[in-house]
Amino acid sequence: MTTETLNIMVEFTGGLEMLFSDQRNHKLTIPQTDSKGDPVTVGWLVNYLCEEIMQDSRKDMFILDDHVRPGILVLINDADWELEGEASYVLQPNDNILFVSTLHGG
């Protein structure tokens, strides 16, 4: 059985890149469907990023109660994810997902 995949770009700014090995851009090849056979969503991607990509143990700086932490702006192809259905947005080939921390220490 072959698994269909999607190529997407994920970017982190505003300090979030430090949670991802100080790498701002991540070109990812991910499965088109989750373990249940449903199309993968941004919500699935957030979990995938925490489980597979993030090397830092401070996952609570990125997620809170299984959701993207308040204070992190998420853009899907340069549009606010609130306009795209937030975590339920179904990922498409060549999507660009940008996570921006709007909270800065001082």
Curated annotation (Swiss-Prot):
Gene name linked to the record: urm1
GO MF annotation terms: protein tag activity
Record lineage: Eukaryota, Fungi, Dikarya, Ascomycota, Pezizomycotina
Protein name according to UniProt: Ubiquitin-related modifier 1
Entry GO CC: cytosol; nucleus
SUPFAM superfamilies associated with the record: MoaD/ThiS
Biological or metabolic pathway of the protein: tRNA modification; 5-methoxycarbonylmethyl-2-thiouridine-tRNA biosynthesis
Post-translational modifications reported in the UniProt record: C-terminal thiocarboxylation occurs in 2 steps, it is first acyl-adenylated (-COAMP) via the hesA/moeB/thiF part of UBA4, then thiocarboxylated (-COSH) via the rhodanese domain of UBA4.
Transmembrane segments: none
Organism in which the protein naturally occurs: Sclerotinia sclerotiorum (strain ATCC 18683 / 1980 / Ss-1) (White mold)
